[in-house]
């Protein structure tokens, strides 16, 4: 990476306007296409990660799935494999602890030589939420949430950026944040989670500033997605609390919880070339929760 002598990395001499990733000749139907590229997904075996993997495969990209289990569970993985086969896309899975810097580097070294197409995208779905009263919450648990949600996002983004820089290819990253990065959740004590997602918002802006116009580097756009409450197995326990579902549904303008499939189009938009003038932004898909 080019170094500055005056310490101001955003001085004009270190910035340049990159060619747009967008193509005005593309038809509207092509704006969500991800052909001839590889997209990396962390937390890929979860409900959101596996749903997005299917959507990305259907949009023409090869997919590298990363997650903590040694092997993906059949429940979600069979549909992902079937989609890859049907669309003749390359699909691979690697076990990875996103908080382990050496493991991240080693895993990237394993899969990069096997790819058909250059890495041009990243979606970070790996995350953790733990709840409990802050006056009793262990520091170790607080650190774990921050380590996975913030450090893990950074480490994989760093490795992805290095792959793009090495190949001199442009790309787009989508960090899964949360509307919880804007305010405290009602009904549950999740100070660590809320803090971590606010940090992801700031990480998004910071990396977008670094990789948007730096001389000598390819253009890498960085945006985040902030979902509202999603009805999944991960939220099932919280929803069992008396009055919780009424609380959560009543706090947004659509008066319901979201489904994982409702985040496919927003992520495809941010990954694709149709969002070529979007970087450093957070796309809040929360049913109007934070606007009320």
Swiss-Prot record:
Enzyme class, spelled out: oxidoreductase
Top-rank taxon, per record: Eukaryota
Keywords from the UniProt entry: NADP, Oxidoreductase
One example of a Gene Ontology biological process annotation: secondary metabolite biosynthetic process
Residues annotated for NADP(+) binding in this entry: 48, 97, 158, 193, 197, 230, 232
One Pfam family hit: adh_short_C2
Biotech use, per record: Notoamides have been shown to exhibit antitumoral activities. Notoamides A-C show moderate cytotoxicity against HeLa and L1210 cells with IC(50) values in the range of 22-52 mg/ml, but the IC(50) value of notoamide D is greater than 100 mg/ml. Moreover, notoamide C induces G2/M-cell cycle arrest at a concentration of 6.3 mg/ml.
Keyword NADP (UniProt): yes
Enzyme Commission numbers on file: 1.1.1.-
Ranges for region Disordered: 1-25
Any GO MF annotation of the entry: oxidoreductase activity, acting on NAD(P)H, oxygen as acceptor
Family (UniProt): Belongs to the short-chain dehydrogenases/reductases (SDR) family.
Function description: Short chain dehydrogenases/reductase; part of the gene cluster that mediates the biosynthesis of notoamide, a fungal indole alkaloid that belongs to a family of natural products containing a characteristic bicyclo[2.2.2]diazaoctane core. The first step of notoamide biosynthesis involves coupling of L-proline and L-tryptophan by the bimodular NRPS notE', to produce cyclo-L-tryptophan-L-proline called brevianamide F.
Protein name from the UniProt record: Short chain dehydrogenases/reductase notP'
Species of the source: Aspergillus versicolor
Protein encoded by which gene: notP'
């Amino acid at each position: 990476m080019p170094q500055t002598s005056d310490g101001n990395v955003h001085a004009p001499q270190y910035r340049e306007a990159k060619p747009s990733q967008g193509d005005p000749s593309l038809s509207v139907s092509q704006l969500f296409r991800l052909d001839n590229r590889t997209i990396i997904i962390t937390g890929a075996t979860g409900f959101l990660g596996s749903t997005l993997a299917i959507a990305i495969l259907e949009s023409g990209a090869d997919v590298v799935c990363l997650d903590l289990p040694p092997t993906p569970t059949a429940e979600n993985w069979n549909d992902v494999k079937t989609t890859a086969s049907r669309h003749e896309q390359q699909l691979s899975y690697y076990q990875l602890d996103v908080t382990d810097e050496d493991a991240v580097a080693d895993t990237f070294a394993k899969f990069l030589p096997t790819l058909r197409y250059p890495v041009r995208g990243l979606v970070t779905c790996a995350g953790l939420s733990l709840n409990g009263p802050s006056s009793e919450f262990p520091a170790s648990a607080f650190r774990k949430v921050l380590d996975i949600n913030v450090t893990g996002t950074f480490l994989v983004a760093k490795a992805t950026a290095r792959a793009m820089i090495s190949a001199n290819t442009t790309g787009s990253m989508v960090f899964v944040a949360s509307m919880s990065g804007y305010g405290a959740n009602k009904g549950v004590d999740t100070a660590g989670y809320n803090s971590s997602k606010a940090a992801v918002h700031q990480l998004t802006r910071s990396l977008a500033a670094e990789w948007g116009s730096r001389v000598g580097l390819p253009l890498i756009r960085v945006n985040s997605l902030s979902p509202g409450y999603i009805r999944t197995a991960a939220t099932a326990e919280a929803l069992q609390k008396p009055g919780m579902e009424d609380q959560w549904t009543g706090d947004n303008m659509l008066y319901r919880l979201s489904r994982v499939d409702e985040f496919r189009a927003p992520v495809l938009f941010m990954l694709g070339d149709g969002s070529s003038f979007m970087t450093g932004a957070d796309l809040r898909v929360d049913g109007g929760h934070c606007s009320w």
